[in-house]
């Protein structure tokens, strides 16, 4: 099959898949597929040759490739389908005016920036609802995750970065880097719709003044900056700026979803998967348990909830092939519960280990009055300070927006540090909860690295840190949350070299739990590429007739 023919068929499948999504939204269905968009049915057990848990990057790849192979597949997603307009005529709410759609069953939003000028003006009281963003709390770390069809792609900043080859090879010594960089990274970028900002427009537009100011300060320090690819459609963004398209990135939308412009998974991989006619997505269903029948069938127990969070049904599913794409937290929790409760007792002892935050630390700097960052800021980062090659202190710092509609002279960053600290998850049988052994000392390593870099920038530019952004305690470095949870079922340890879970046949992991705690860049392109590699091998060897 030629590339052009593949692209034409994929386009046709995308159209069919998008139609299925629209039909499900219009009729309020919780099950989405070309032949089966319908409300949930009271069948005792749903069976399919393959089941995918989760519809984030790894799960979406698995769903598309299974569907293309003609294998009937069910995708189980605990969040809702996000394509029905709210009372304001929009699917998602803005960052500055959050409502019930913003957070997963919370009474109040929990944004990464908690205060401004030490005032509690960022977070808002909201109604409880299966919103699009969740913040999962552990003792010394909290993790942001997306909830909905498309997972984290709905709520991230779209930065589609391929890691430095040398660091990828160090993190994945058993993976063929030539194959990854020659085949699977390009395949992932093409399917995700990765593009780059037009440099001339970037230099001239008011919407990226904040990036240019940070670039100037980095250059004065002797540091290198680099443009960062994105899955946000920059053609659409330029039309937003021109007033010929509805504003999304230029309208303050990002962490609670984008109404336009973003190529989230429901518009790419998942639309293509549904378009095959072989894939059905079940929403608002959370898998609680996995076991295996004597004949080798995997048996799943899932709770279906309504929009109040009430469990309205507990269902069982059966499948021959089971793909775990629930993310670092979701997949690890399911496997640990199965191992510790004895339903999958042969799982490897390394399940739960090797977890890290990708070295995430957020911070702000106070600029001089003449270094205005602009009242108008795009919510999509397109540039980073790249000091990763500094062996003594490797850091990649995203130049992040802080769109308030007012000039505030703040330069904001999400630093990705090479933090070698790792923690393990455990399962508490008494409370049926996942526990994380991450400590404040683990986070302190990332803080020290970020501080070392930004102390240099402040010294070169005679600037200081902002102390008013992360709560009432004058905290400079926000080290208690991560956007990039990685690990828990590490490739080559808890699995073989292709994501096959040790101890069980036809059980696979395709998500960020495969990554050993650190990538040095935003991880979703790597997760997608690794999932493509897994699916190519599994479909060639495990499902062949």
Residue ranges and their predicted role:
Residues 1-14, 36-38:
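N-terminal secretory signal peptides
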Residues 10-27:
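N-terminal export leaders
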Residues 41-170, 175, 302, 330, ...:
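N-terminal glycine-rich phosphate/pyrophosphate-binding loop and immediately adjacent elements
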Residues 51-53, 317-327:
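Short hydrophobic core segments
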Residues 122-145, 149-156, 170, 174, ...:
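FAD cofactor-binding and catalytic pocket of flavoenzymes
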Residues 138, 174-286, 473-482, 490:
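Conserved redox-cofactor binding core of oxidoreductases
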Residues 291-316:
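Conserved beta-strand-loop-beta-strand element in the redox core of flavoprotein oxidoreductases
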Residues 451-518, 524, 528:
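A glycine-rich dinucleotide-binding beta-alpha-beta segment and adjacent secondary-structure elements
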């Amino acid at each position: 099959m030629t590339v052009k023919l593949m692209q034409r068929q994929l386009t046709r499948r995308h159209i069919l898949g998008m139609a299925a999504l629209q039909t499900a939204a219009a009729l309020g269905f919780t099950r989405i597929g070309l032949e089966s968009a319908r409300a949930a049915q009271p069948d005792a057990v749903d069976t399919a040759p393959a089941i995918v848990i989760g519809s984030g990057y790894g799960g979406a790849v698995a769903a598309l490739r299974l569907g293309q192979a003609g294998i009937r597949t069910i995708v189980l997603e605990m969040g809702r389908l996000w394509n029905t307009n709210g009372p304001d005529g929009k699917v998602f709410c803005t960052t500055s005016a959050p409502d019930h759609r913003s957070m997963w069953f919370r009474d109040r939003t929990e944004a990464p920036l908690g205060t401004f000028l030490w005032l509690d003006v960022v977070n808002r009281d909201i109604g409880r609802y299966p919103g699009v963003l969740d913040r999962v709390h552990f003792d010394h770390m909290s993790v942001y995750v997306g909830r909905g069809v498309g997972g984290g792609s709905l709520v991230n900043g779209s930065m589609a970065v391929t890691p430095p080859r040398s660091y990828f090879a160090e993190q994945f010594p058993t993976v063929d880097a030539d194959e990854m960089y020659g085949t699977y990274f390009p395949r992932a970028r093409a399917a995700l719709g990765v593009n780059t900002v037009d440099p001339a427009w970037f230099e001239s537009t008011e919407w990226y003044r904040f990036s240019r100011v940070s670039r100037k300060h980095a250059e004065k320090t002797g540091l290198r900056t680099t443009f960062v690819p994105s899955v946000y459609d920059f053609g659409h963004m330029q039309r937003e700026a021109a007033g010929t398209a509805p504003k999304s990135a230029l309208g303050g939308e990002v962490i609670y979803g984008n109404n336009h412009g973003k190529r989230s998974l429901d518009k790419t991989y998942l639309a293509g998967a549904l378009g095959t006619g072989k894939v059905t997505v079940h929403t608002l269903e959370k898998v609680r348990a996995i076991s295996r029948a004597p004949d080798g069938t995997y048996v799943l127990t899932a709770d279906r909830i309504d929009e109040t969070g009430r469990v309205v049904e507990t269902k069982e599913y059966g499948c021959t092939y089971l793909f775990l794409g629930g993310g670092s937290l979701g997949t690890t929790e399911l496997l640990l519960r199965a191992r510790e409760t004895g339903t999958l007792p042969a799982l490897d002892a390394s399940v739960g280990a090797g977890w890290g935050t990708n070295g995430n630390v957020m911070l702000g700097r106070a600029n001089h009055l003449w270094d205005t960052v602009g009242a108008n800021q795009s919510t999509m980062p397109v540039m980073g300070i790249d000091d990763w090659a500094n062996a003594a202190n490797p850091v990649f710092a995203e130049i992040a927006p802080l769109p308030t509609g007012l000039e505030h002279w703040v330069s904001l960053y999400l630093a990705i540090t090479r933090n070698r600290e790792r923690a393990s998850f455990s399962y508490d049988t008494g409370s049926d909860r996942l526990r994380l052994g991450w400590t404040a000392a683990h986070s302190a390593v990332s803080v020290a690295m970020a501080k070392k870099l930004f102390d240099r920038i402040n010294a070169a530019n005679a600037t200081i840190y902002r102390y008013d952004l992360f709560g009432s305690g004058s905290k400079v470095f926000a080290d208690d949350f991560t956007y990039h949870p990685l690990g828990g079922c590490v490739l080559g340890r808890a699995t073989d070299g292709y994501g096959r879970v040790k101890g069980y046949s036809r059980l696979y992991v395709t998500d960020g739990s495969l990554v050993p705690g650190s990538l040095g860049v935003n991880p979703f392109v790597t997760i997608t590429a690794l999932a493509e590699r897994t699916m190519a091998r599994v479909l060639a060897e495990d499902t062949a007739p």
